[in-house]
Regions:
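N-terminal hydrophobic or amphipathic helices and topogenic motifs
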Residues: 2, 23-104, 289-323
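Bacterial N-terminal signal peptides
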Residues: 10-18
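Bilobed "Venus flytrap"/periplasmic-binding protein-like clamshell domains
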Residues: 64-87, 122, 145-214, 229
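Periplasmic-binding protein-like
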Residues: 67, 142-151, 239-277, 292-312
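Short beta-strand-to-loop elements that line the ligand-binding cleft
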Residues: 93-100, 198-208, 246-249
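Short helices/loops that flank or line small-molecule/ion binding pockets
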Residues: 103-117, 130, 164, 209-229
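Acidic, polar ligand-binding/catalytic clefts
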Residues: 107-165
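A ligand-binding cleft/hinge motif common to bilobed small-molecule-binding domains
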Residues: 121-132, 185-191, 215-218, 222-242
């Protein structure tokens, strides 16, 4: 599978090429921007459950993955208690799938090898349109507030004081599907500061937020655009000395990672999956220890809650055209 986008993300999505088994005879139905493998009859912008019962799945083992913002091994331990809760609630075995890239995660869901996932905020639209991902939840604080900001960071002793100073420098981004790691900063730098990629600054890609952050800490990168949710968690874990970096820009608040399921998952199983999320006991859990500002999972409406991110995609020329 290849994505044709005005922002070329061939490298980021190379894992989509040469997938088989999912592209069956296509149904003539409303689908909006969804890939031709899916239908959207109710207009919620996500893929409907297949009308053919043979395409509905109820696996004996559920595969779960979390967006690869840092070393997957770190988060496998963080999610262990949640996975046990998911097993208890669904009555299924659950396996954690440690993905190394966003593209690998989307590919796994599209090809039927991933059933439940936490997908990076900026990648939700891509996963929805091209992998049949149906987001239904995100983390929120006890008072129901949620979200994160994009920050541009530099080494503490850098001569770069504000975004306009980035002209003529290299900026580290994570990958082309990331909202805070690429799409939002690209749009903001162009719209608010008149800085265009390749014309005014040289973009480089680190692959993940932690790579970008540590690259600035170690002065491998002159600047980096990152999600401050990841940044703050790394600071809280004392992964690095926060005195070694400085923030020169902080954006408006964006929705954070979306949690969802494969569109063809059995509806009765989906209800159990949702129950496992919304009734998960946060108090004393590893999730509470890692995501300290969060206190629960709350329902989301992809059509409404991701509108701002789809607008950023539109502004930066992203088109969800899957082949």
């Amino acid at each position: 599978m290849r994505l044709n986008r005005s922002l070329t993300v061939v490298a980021a999505l190379s894992g989509f090429i040469a997938m088989s088994g999912m592209a069956t005879a296509q149904e003539d139905c409303p689908r909006g921007t969804l890939d031709k493998s899916y239908c959207d009859r109710n207009g919620d912008l996500t893929a409907d459950l297949p009308t053919d019962p043979k395409k509905v799945i109820n696996p004996s083992t559920l595969i779960f993955s979390y967006t690869p913002v840092e070393d997957p091994a770190v988060y496998q331990k963080v999610w262990d208690g949640f996975i046990k809760n998911l097993e208890k609630t669904t009555g299924k075995k659950v396996a954690f799938f440690p993905v190394q890239s966003n593209a690998a995660q989307y590919e796994a869901m599209r090809s039927g090898r991933l059933h439940v996932a936490g997908v990076n905020a900026g990648g939700n639209a891509l996963a929805v349109n091209c992998a049949g991902f149906v987001p239904f939840a995100m983390m929120a604080a006890p008072d129901n507030s949620f979200g994160y900001e994009m920050e541009i960071i530099v080494p503490a002793d850098s001569p770069i004081k504000e975004p306009t100073d980035l002209k003529g420098h290299k900026i580290a981004f994570t990958d082309a599907t990331s909202n805070s790691g690429f799409k939002a900063p690209s749009a903001i730098l162009k719209a608010d500061f008149g800085l265009e990629s390749k014309r005014d600054f040289e973009p480089v890609f680190s692959g993940k937020h932690d790579n970008s952050i540590l690259g600035v800490v170690n002065k491998d990168y002159e600047a980096a655009a990152v999600a401050n949710s990841v940044l703050n968690r790394m600071i809280d874990r004392k992964v690095f000395d926060k005195a070694k970096i400085r923030s020169i820009y902080k954006s408006e608040t964006f929705p954070t990672s979306g949690y969802g399921y494969a569109h063809n998952l059995d509806p009765k199983l989906v209800e159990k999956v949702k129950e496992a999320f919304f009734k998960f006991p946060w108090e004393g859990s590893a999730l509470q220890a890692e995501f300290q500002k969060e206190g629960k999972f709350v329902p989301i409406d992809y059509k409404k809650d991701w509108a701002v991110l789809r607008k950023i995609d539109e502004a930066t020329g992203v088109k969800y055209t899957c082949k």
